[in-house]
From Swiss-Prot:
SUPFAM superfamilies: Serpins. The keyword Chaperone does not apply. One of its GO terms (molecular function) is serine-type endopeptidase inhibitor activity. This is Serine protease inhibitor 3/4. It comes from Lonomia obliqua (Moth). InterPro entries: Serpin_dom, Serpin_fam, Serpin_sf, Serpin_sf_1, Serpin_sf_2. Keywords: Protease inhibitor, Serine protease inhibitor, Signal.
Amino acid sequence: RPLRPGKILICIFALAALTTATETDLQRILRDGNDQFTAKMLPEIVKENPNKNIVFSAFSVMSPLAQLAIASAGESRDELFSAIGFPNENVTKAVFTDLNRELKSVKGVTLKIANKIYIANGFELNDQFAVVSKDVFNSEVQKLDFAQNKVAAKTINTWVEDHTNNRIKDLVDPNSLDDYTRAVLVNALYFKGSWKNKFDKESTIDRPFHVDNTKTIQVPTMHRSGQYSYGESRELNAKIIEMPYEGDETSLVIVLPNTVDGIHNLLEKLKDPKVLSRVEKDMHEIDVDVYVPKFKIETTTDLKKVLQNMNIKKLFNGSEARLDYLLKKSDALYVSEAVQKAFIEVNEEGAEAAAANEFAANFSSFTRDRNYLIVKQTVRVFP
């Protein structure tokens, strides 16, 4: 069966920890939480990037939010746990401990997740939070003089580059750091995988790409025929294909609307966090004639605005945030800035993707071939 593209590319790099039939309770909680968080985040990201090709990782945002939830109190804490879909601190710690252990065993691809907390000179992490950050999230800790904002930003950005194979650059703007910055939480995720069945470069030629119902352009498009897990969904009015990487534990899932203007309906359907799981159950191995454009996308997202629209509000309010357990000194802290930079490239050899997030905690000044591809990276964790 032919699978041909059309219109503007929308790409989600949603690295999800999934499992086979022998899924454990912790893996189910993580999968459900990630699906729920991604479904909420997707429309907000699209709203912030109208008519653009986008890439983002909801999964990589969950780790720093989970850390902040554990460091929070009151309504700040409630909002964060509700957003990430975990019932309480103990479950959250168990889920991320299990995840970090399982990801070390993923075969056939390069997959790295790193966390780091930078704190201002003269301050210390809360003792209990320091233990959780190290044991659960594998977070490194480093002191910085944020008043030297250019030096501090360069230090953080160099760490991000080192942990994303130089794909994510200039995550932190020096102007976002100053004397009032007390801590910066940074998360970096990097993935690189080779296709189990590679595309022949000689088969890549310019083919029509439908920007909309009236405009068509030529773009380099890969082609391969072979057996893939494939499905056609009436619910989504779309075709779905899963393209495995080497090792058979990771894959790229592509959802293609049946009509040139079908992306808007598809995005509405994807607000249901369970819809892809339902659709994937009906996929089967068949011979497929696959056409996929080569693409490279980079997106910078103002997470502060996105997360506020997802009902994480107290965290960013200088008079209402309760980050009581982040530092030993009980300064009135709030998150002044949250940014994600994400990158993905897909070519004949495979795919490379990276994402990095920055959450800056400041001393509160109040107390002083169609919009056409939806792409999901999956990691199958075998217990």
